[in-house]
């Protein structure tokens, strides 16, 4: 995955004078699964529409295989889109839905038969060729939408929140299947999602967006473990963010009257324009007087796979902790963490 198949350079978009994309730049490698992740209204779907050709940017460049993509009409782009609604034709059976694009192109019947059946087998629905769309489950409809897109042999598959209409259990199953399918066929997937867990589990890289700007680009591990700002840290899972700490020097921070080790460097000396993040799952609960701070449990919530515990120290700082152990409200404890689980980042600067 070394070659860029797609590149956006300083792309902007306005609707009725409102700027919805503010200089978007990123690249997509050939064979990569990349997710545009962010809350509703952040601009991620607009980017997908611009790449697909249904909308034009106000400014900027888009290169596909090093050639200007913007003037190429939508029907000439080597992309296919899977929409949230799947956009299947209810009056056609499964075979004819998958074959639709090839039929419109007047492809020979023997080629249609071969390619459609190959894709139906690929998505695990052999034997469903003559079924009507309304006879299919949500997961089966999604597979047919995928087969219909892939039969056209696109170089890039665009996915607009494809799992949004599925229930939680089926969504997880389809996430695994879609990732496996992408790895098997090896083409580039660009997916839009507002689901953090979905993006983390499926993507090679994630483009995190908010209010028309890119907040961070990185692998799932980089996004989760090394967020570039407090907004990303809060959006990708819950976080304990210390906004009033000081970076004393390389590998040393200070807050609430105590000095702690960390693994971060190059933030200067006695620097206060930083935020410090410690994830809830990285905090260790100990018996009183065995940690960095003594604290009292003030809230407990069972989350299914763990307990979420909120404790408050004598400094009146509250900490969110994820643990498999149960604690009682008002129970006295202490808390600590490892230096490698402390993450320092620059404070966000308002433009």
Swiss-Prot record:
Residues 6-236 form the ABC transporter domain. It is found in: Cell membrane. SMART domains: AAA. The lineage of its organism: Bacteria, Bacillati, Mycoplasmatota, Mollicutes, Mycoplasmataceae. This is Spermidine/putrescine import ATP-binding protein PotA. It catalyses: ATP + H2O + polyamine-[polyamine-binding protein]Side 1 = ADP + phosphate + polyamineSide 2 + [polyamine-binding protein]Side 1. The complex is composed of two ATP-binding proteins (PotA), two transmembrane proteins (PotB and PotC) and a solute-binding protein (PotD). It is a peripheral membrane protein. Keywords: ATP-binding, Cell membrane, Membrane, Nucleotide-binding, Translocase, Transport. PANTHER family: SPERMIDINE/PUTRESCINE IMPORT ATP-BINDING PROTEIN POTA (PTHR42781), SPERMIDINE_PUTRESCINE IMPORT ATP-BINDING PROTEIN POTA (PTHR42781:SF4). It holds the Pfam family TOBE_2. One of its GO terms (molecular function) is ATP binding. The keyword Amino-acid biosynthesis does not apply. NCBIfam families: MMSYN1_0197.
């Amino acid at each position: 995955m070394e070659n860029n198949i797609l590149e956006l350079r300083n792309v902007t978009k306005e609707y009725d004078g409102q700027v919805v994309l503010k200089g978007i730049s990123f690249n997509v490698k050939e064979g990569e699964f990349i997710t545009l992740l962010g809350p509703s209204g952040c601009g991620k779907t607009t980017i997908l529409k611009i790449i697909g050709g249904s909308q034009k940017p106000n400014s900027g460049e888009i290169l596909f295989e090093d050639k200007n993509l913007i003037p190429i009409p939508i029907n000439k782009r080597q992309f296919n889109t899977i929409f949230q609604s799947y956009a299947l034709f209810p009056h056609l059976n499964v075979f004819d839905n998958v074959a639709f694009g090839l039929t419109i192109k007047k492809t020979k019947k023997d080629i249609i038969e071969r390619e459609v059946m190959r894709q139906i087998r690929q998505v695990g629905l052999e034997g469903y060729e003559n079924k009507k769309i309304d006879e299919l489950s949500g997961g089966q409809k999604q597979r047919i939408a995928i087969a219909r897109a892939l039969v056209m042999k696109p170089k890039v598959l665009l996915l607009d929140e494809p799992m949004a209409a599925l229930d939680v259990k089926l969504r997880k199953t389809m996430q695994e299947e879609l990732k496996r399918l992408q790895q098997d066929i090896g083409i580039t997937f660009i997916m839009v999602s507002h689901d953090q867990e979905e993006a983390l589990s499926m993507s090679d890289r994630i483009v995190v967006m908010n209010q028309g700007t890119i907040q961070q680009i990185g692998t799932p591990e980089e996004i989760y473990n090394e967020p570039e700002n407090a907004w990303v840290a809060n959006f990708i899972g819950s976080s304990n963010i210390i906004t009033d700490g000081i970076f004393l020097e390389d590998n040393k921070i200070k807050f609430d009257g105590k000095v702690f080790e960390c693994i971060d460097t190059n933030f200067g000396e006695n620097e206060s324009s930083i935020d410090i993040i410690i994830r809830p799952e990285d905090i260790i609960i100990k018996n009183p007087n065995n940690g960095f701070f003594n604290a009292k449990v003030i809230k407990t919530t069972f989350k299914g796979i763990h307990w979420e515990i909120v404790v408050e120290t004598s400094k009146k700082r509250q900490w969110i902790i994820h643990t498999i152990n149960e604690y009682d409200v008002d129970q006295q404890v202490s808390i600590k963490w490892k230096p490698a689980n402390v993450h320092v980042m620059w404070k966000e600067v308002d433009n």
